[in-house]
Regions:
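Outer membrane beta-barrel
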Residues: 1-78, 89-91, 98-106, 160-163
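Residue-level detector of functional hotspots within protein domains
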Residues: 3, 41-45, 83, 121-125, ...
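Outer-membrane beta-barrel and related beta-rich outer-membrane complex signature
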Residues: 29-33, 83-85, 121, 151
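Detector for outer-membrane/organellar transmembrane beta-barrel domains
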Residues: 68, 88, 98-167
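A short, flexible beta-alpha/helix-coil linker loop
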Residues: 78-81, 144-146
């Protein structure tokens, strides 16, 4: 099945707009390419809790100054990957900020609102990683809250330390 089909334009340096079917900008791990994965699959948070592809429009801005950061945000149809035959009245949104305070550091903060049926779901995610020549240390926390107390709130934590063996 087709996962992504989108067009991306770069009207000015460090700014882009994307329209089409794509992964929603959310979590620290969801946008890693397969060759950048640390395990056989994505983390639990990226795969099970924050794994959303949808049809929509996003914008991203990269700042490369003294305190570099990347801001991404988008509006989405809300029907998800498998049900694109109808347009929902409520648009979903996602906002993601990657703060790059030092050469080897990444702090990611993101929020997402989806409404797959009649229940609104708000998710908040915070992650941090440190990468040097051999070590990758990462931790991520996600809080998922269902509207009208439809389900209990979800707390998910993912953390790991990876050591690369030289070949």
């Amino acid at each position: 099945k087709m996962l992504d089909a989108y067009a991306r334009v770069f009207p000015v340096k460090d700014l882009n707009f994307t329209i089409g079917q794509m992964r929603v900008p959310f979590t620290i791990d969801a946008h890693r390419s397969p060759h950048q994965q640390y395990f056989a699959n994505r983390s639990f948070i990226a795969k099970q809790v924050g794994n959303v592809r949808d049809v929509g429009l996003t914008s991203a801005y990269r700042h490369k100054g003294d305190f570099p950061f990347i801001l991404e945000g988008g509006l989405f149809n809300g029907s998800g990957l498998t049900n694109q035959k109808e347009w929902h009245k409520t648009l979903n949104y996602s906002i993601k900020a990657q703060l790059l305070p030092g050469k080897n550091w990444n702090v990611t903060l993101s929020t997402q609102m989806i409404k797959p049926e009649d229940v609104r779901i708000n998710m908040y995610d915070a992650g941090i990683y440190y990468q040097n020549n051999r070590f990758h240390i990462e931790a991520e926390y996600l809080y998922k809250m269902y509207g009208h107390n439809a389900f209990k709130d979800v707390h998910a934590v993912n953390s790991f330390v990876n050591y690369d063996l030289p070949l």
